[in-house]
Amino acid sequence: MLDEALAIVTAAWSGEPVHHRGEHYTVDGVRFLPRPARPGGVPVWVAGFPGKPRPLRRAARYQGFFPVNLEHPDQLAESVARLSELRDDPGAPYDVVAALPPGTDPAPYAAAGATWHLVEFPWDALSVDAVRSVIRDRTG
Protein backbone atom coordinates (compact mmCIF):
# COMPACT_ATOMS: atom_id res chain seq x y z
CA MET A 1 0.00 0.00 0.00
CA LEU A 2 2.76 2.45 0.96
CA ASP A 3 4.84 1.59 -2.11
CA GLU A 4 1.88 2.31 -4.36
CA ALA A 5 1.11 5.60 -2.57
CA LEU A 6 4.73 6.76 -2.82
CA ALA A 7 4.77 5.98 -6.54
CA ILE A 8 1.66 8.13 -7.05
CA VAL A 9 2.95 11.02 -4.95
CA THR A 10 6.38 11.12 -6.57
CA ALA A 11 4.80 10.99 -10.04
CA ALA A 12 2.43 13.83 -9.13
CA TRP A 13 5.39 16.03 -8.15
CA SER A 14 6.22 16.26 -11.86
CA GLY A 15 3.32 18.68 -12.22
CA GLU A 16 1.85 16.50 -14.96
CA PRO A 17 -1.48 14.71 -14.54
CA VAL A 18 -1.12 11.23 -13.06
CA HIS A 19 -3.43 8.39 -14.03
CA HIS A 20 -3.11 5.26 -11.93
CA ARG A 21 -5.20 2.17 -11.37
CA GLY A 22 -3.60 -0.09 -8.82
CA GLU A 23 -4.39 -2.64 -6.18
CA HIS A 24 -5.09 -0.01 -3.51
CA TYR A 25 -5.54 3.33 -5.27
CA THR A 26 -7.14 4.79 -8.35
CA VAL A 27 -6.37 8.36 -9.41
CA ASP A 28 -7.32 10.16 -12.59
CA GLY A 29 -5.57 13.36 -13.54
CA VAL A 30 -4.11 14.14 -10.12
CA ARG A 31 -1.17 16.55 -10.07
CA PHE A 32 0.57 18.73 -7.51
CA LEU A 33 0.96 22.39 -8.30
CA PRO A 34 3.10 24.21 -7.74
CA ARG A 35 5.72 21.55 -8.31
CA PRO A 36 8.37 21.17 -5.62
CA ALA A 37 11.22 23.63 -6.11
CA ARG A 38 13.78 20.87 -5.59
CA PRO A 39 14.53 18.85 -8.74
CA GLY A 40 13.18 15.34 -8.29
CA GLY A 41 10.68 16.47 -5.67
CA VAL A 42 10.63 16.44 -1.90
CA PRO A 43 13.13 14.06 -0.26
CA VAL A 44 11.35 10.99 1.12
CA TRP A 45 12.65 9.49 4.34
CA VAL A 46 11.26 6.00 4.88
CA ALA A 47 10.76 4.88 8.47
CA GLY A 48 11.18 1.30 9.59
CA PHE A 49 12.68 -1.01 12.15
CA PRO A 50 16.45 -1.45 11.78
CA GLY A 51 17.36 -4.76 10.21
CA LYS A 52 13.91 -5.48 8.76
CA PRO A 53 14.38 -6.28 5.05
CA ARG A 54 11.21 -4.79 3.58
CA PRO A 55 11.56 -1.24 5.01
CA LEU A 56 15.26 -1.24 4.12
CA ARG A 57 14.49 -2.22 0.51
CA ARG A 58 11.89 0.54 0.36
CA ALA A 59 14.22 3.09 1.95
CA ALA A 60 16.95 2.22 -0.56
CA ARG A 61 14.70 3.46 -3.38
CA TYR A 62 14.22 6.88 -1.77
CA GLN A 63 16.37 9.59 -0.20
CA GLY A 64 16.64 8.57 3.42
CA PHE A 65 16.02 6.15 6.26
CA PHE A 66 14.48 6.97 9.63
CA PRO A 67 14.94 3.94 11.90
CA VAL A 68 12.38 3.55 14.66
CA ASN A 69 13.12 2.04 18.07
CA LEU A 70 16.84 2.46 17.52
CA GLU A 71 18.56 1.04 20.59
CA HIS A 72 22.28 1.32 19.84
CA PRO A 73 24.70 2.56 17.16
CA ASP A 74 25.50 -0.98 15.97
CA GLN A 75 21.91 -1.38 14.76
CA LEU A 76 22.30 1.79 12.74
CA ALA A 77 25.67 0.73 11.30
CA GLU A 78 24.17 -2.59 10.16
CA SER A 79 21.25 -0.80 8.49
CA VAL A 80 23.55 1.72 6.78
CA ALA A 81 25.74 -1.10 5.45
CA ARG A 82 22.70 -2.95 4.10
CA LEU A 83 21.32 0.23 2.53
CA SER A 84 24.66 0.77 0.78
CA GLU A 85 24.30 -2.69 -0.77
CA LEU A 86 20.69 -2.09 -1.81
CA ARG A 87 20.92 1.42 -3.24
CA ASP A 88 21.39 1.88 -6.99
CA ASP A 89 23.99 4.62 -6.39
CA PRO A 90 25.54 4.21 -2.93
CA GLY A 91 27.65 7.33 -3.50
CA ALA A 92 24.65 9.63 -4.04
CA PRO A 93 23.60 11.88 -1.15
CA TYR A 94 21.46 10.01 1.36
CA ASP A 95 20.02 10.92 4.75
CA VAL A 96 20.03 8.65 7.78
CA VAL A 97 18.22 9.91 10.86
CA ALA A 98 19.03 9.06 14.47
CA ALA A 99 16.21 10.06 16.82
CA LEU A 100 17.66 9.98 20.32
CA PRO A 101 16.43 10.92 23.80
CA PRO A 102 17.67 14.23 25.25
CA GLY A 103 21.15 13.93 26.67
CA THR A 104 22.21 11.05 24.41
CA ASP A 105 25.58 11.60 22.74
CA PRO A 106 24.94 11.62 18.97
CA ALA A 107 28.64 11.05 18.08
CA PRO A 108 28.50 7.21 18.06
CA TYR A 109 25.43 7.39 15.82
CA ALA A 110 27.15 9.83 13.47
CA ALA A 111 30.11 7.44 13.32
CA ALA A 112 27.63 4.67 12.44
CA GLY A 113 26.32 6.71 9.50
CA ALA A 114 23.68 9.09 10.84
CA THR A 115 23.53 12.35 8.91
CA TRP A 116 20.74 13.86 11.03
CA HIS A 117 20.21 13.86 14.79
CA LEU A 118 16.71 14.56 16.06
CA VAL A 119 15.93 14.89 19.73
CA GLU A 120 13.14 12.48 20.62
CA PHE A 121 11.18 13.84 23.54
CA PRO A 122 9.05 11.43 25.57
CA TRP A 123 5.41 12.12 24.69
CA ASP A 124 4.27 11.81 28.28
CA ALA A 125 6.85 14.20 29.73
CA LEU A 126 7.17 16.88 27.07
CA SER A 127 7.56 20.40 28.38
CA VAL A 128 8.48 23.77 26.93
CA ASP A 129 11.40 23.98 29.36
CA ALA A 130 12.80 20.65 28.15
CA VAL A 131 12.67 21.80 24.52
CA ARG A 132 14.24 25.17 25.39
CA SER A 133 17.02 23.38 27.25
CA VAL A 134 17.91 21.23 24.24
CA ILE A 135 17.85 24.25 21.92
CA ARG A 136 20.04 26.21 24.33
CA ASP A 137 22.51 23.31 24.60
CA ARG A 138 22.71 22.95 20.79
CA THR A 139 23.06 26.64 19.93
CA GLY A 140 25.37 27.73 22.74
Q: What is each stretch, according to the model?
A:
Residues 1-140:
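Active-site-adjacent structural elements that line small-molecule/cofactor binding pockets in enzymes
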